[in-house]
């Protein structure tokens, strides 16, 4: 059986990166919440 996590830097950036977050309303909400919480890293 193939494992579910097959790492790819490109896919990671595209799906969970900063620009991907900024491109949707919900994503911007995520960044706002992470900033409010004081997260060092906002996105992948």
UniProtKB/Swiss-Prot annotation:
Residues 1-44 are annotated as: Disordered. GO terms for cellular component: ribonucleoprotein complex; ribosome. The keyword Ribosomal protein applies. Residues 10-19, 26-44 have a biased composition (Basic residues). Pfam families: Ribosomal_L34. InterPro entries: Ribosomal_bL34 (IPR000271), Ribosomal_bL34_CS (IPR020939). Transmembrane segments: none annotated. One of its GO terms (biological process) is translation. Belongs to the bacterial ribosomal protein bL34 family. This is Large ribosomal subunit protein bL34. It comes from Rhizobium meliloti (strain 1021) (Ensifer meliloti). The lineage of its organism: Bacteria, Pseudomonadati, Pseudomonadota, Alphaproteobacteria, Hyphomicrobiales.
């Amino acid at each position: 059986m193939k494992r579910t996590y097959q790492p790819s830097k490109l896919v990671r950036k595209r799906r969970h990166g900063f620009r991907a977050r900024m491109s949707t309303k919900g994503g911007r909400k995520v960044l706002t919440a992470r900033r409010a919480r004081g997260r060092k890293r906002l996105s992948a």
